[in-house]
């Protein structure tokens, strides 16, 4: 084996980025290596290999990367805090709205959840009386209110005073309707005497008017003591209130002193011979026979809207 000369010797130095020392120390080392190689006269070829990424970064680059990462982390933290703050605010707003609603309900300004009207203060369901009762809730507000409006109270105050005239008028009306059915025997006899005298062409018999009629129309001095009047009696059919049977009666209307007197004459049965004659003796049917010296006359009819009556004892007549 021959000797190897120094010119054939190659020294392989590691690449620059494989140096663990600082930049200054690495450059000094390369300078020393180059100087040694030049002194030896041997070429130095650096070893170029595919190594790991650069690890030795300057301080400014490291600081920049660190600040960038820190800024990104801070942004993420800010976003997280913002989302948390937003959700917290929503929760707080909802809680405050619920509190305000409960406060408004407690203060008496709450509205019904169903119809929107004002809710009752005592209602725990926050509803008006109608909705609360219709839904079947157990609430103390279901008791019916005893409040009465002012208009209704005025009506109640006026009704007792106004009820008396109404009651009086109803009583008078009812009594007026019952009077034709309840006629005293004395008045019937007087009316029968008037009918007998007026229809038999005989001098009319005088009779004294009832005191109740005189007192009802005014003082006794204003009414004549005796009245002679010709009257026409109209035959009508009436129905009894007790048994509902139909019977015939005569209706008379007399005007005395500006007042109208009317009444019914009911059948009282057969009278004795010395009493008043029967209806057949009055010849209302228009027969041509004479009876007891009384000539027959035409049927007497009651013209419509004609009131019969007489003056104050000076004769008889009729008024339309």
UniProtKB/Swiss-Prot annotation:
Explain what induces or represses this protein's expression. Expression repressed by LDL1 via histone H3 and H4 deacetylation.
The UniProt GO MF terms for this protein read: DNA binding; DNA-binding transcription factor activity; metal ion binding; protein homodimerization activity
Claim: Metal-binding is one of the keywords in the record: yes
Indicate the residues that the entry says bind DNA.
112-139
Keywords recorded for this protein, A-Z: Activator, Auxin biosynthesis, Auxin signaling pathway, Developmental protein, DNA-binding, Metal-binding, Nucleus, Zinc
One of this protein's GO BP terms? pollen development
Pfam families with a match to the protein in the record: DUF702 (PF05142)
Known InterPro entries for this protein? SHI, SHI_C, Znf_LRP1
Q: What does this protein do?
A: Transcription activator that binds DNA on 5'-ACTCTAC-3' and promotes auxin homeostasis-regulating gene expression (e.g. YUC genes), as well as genes affecting stamen development, cell expansion and timing of flowering. Synergistically with other SHI-related proteins, regulates gynoecium, stamen and leaf development in a dose-dependent manner, controlling apical-basal patterning. Promotes style and stigma formation, and influence vascular development during gynoecium development. May also have a role in the formation and/or maintenance of the shoot apical meristem (SAM). Modulates root growth.
Family recorded in the similarity comment: Belongs to the SHI protein family.
NCBIfam families named in the record: LRP1_Cterm (TIGR01624), put_zinc_LRP1 (TIGR01623)
UniProt name for this protein: Protein LATERAL ROOT PRIMORDIUM 1
Instruction: Identify the species of origin.
Output: Arabidopsis thaliana (Mouse-ear cress)
- Gene encoding this polypeptide? LRP1
């Amino acid at each position: 084996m021959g000797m190897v000369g120094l010119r054939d010797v190659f020294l392989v130095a590691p690449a620059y980025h494989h140096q663990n020392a600082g930049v200054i120390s690495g450059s000094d080392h390369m300078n020393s290596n180059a100087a040694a190689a030049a002194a030896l006269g041997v070429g130095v070829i650096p070893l170029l290999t595919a190594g790991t990424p650069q690890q030795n970064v300057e301080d400014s680059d490291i600081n920049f990367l660190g600040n960038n990462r820190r800024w990104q982390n801070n942004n993420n933290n800010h976003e997280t805090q913002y989302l948390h703050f937003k959700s917290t605010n929503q929760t707080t707003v909802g809680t405050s709205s619920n509190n305000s609603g409960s406060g408004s309900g407690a203060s008496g300004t709450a509205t019904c959840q169903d119809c929107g009207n004002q809710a009752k203060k005592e209602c725990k369901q926050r509803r008006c009386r109608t909705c609360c009762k219709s839904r079947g809730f157990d609430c103390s507000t279901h008791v019916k209110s005893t409040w009465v409006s002012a208009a209704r109270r005025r009506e109640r105050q006026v009704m007792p005073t106004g009820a008396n005239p109404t009651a009086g008028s109803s009583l008078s009306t009812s009594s007026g309707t019952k009077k034709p059915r309840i006629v005293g025997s004395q008045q019937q006899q007087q009316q029968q005497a008037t009918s007998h005298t007026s229809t038999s062409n005989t001098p009319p018999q005088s009779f004294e008017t009832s005191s109740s009629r005189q007192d009802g129309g005014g003082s006794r001095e204003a009414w004549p003591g005796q009245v002679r009047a010709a009257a026409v009696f109209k035959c009508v059919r009436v129905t009894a209130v007790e048994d509902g049977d139909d019977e015939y009666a005569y209706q008379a209307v007399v005007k005395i002193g500006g007042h109208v007197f009317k009444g019914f004459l009911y059948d009282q049965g057969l009278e004795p011979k010395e009493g008043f004659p029967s209806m057949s003796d009055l010849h209302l049917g228009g027969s041509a026979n004479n009876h007891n010296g009384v000539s027959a006359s035409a049927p007497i009819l009651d013209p419509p809207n004609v009131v019969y009556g007489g003056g104050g004892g000076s004769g008889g007549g009729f008024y339309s």
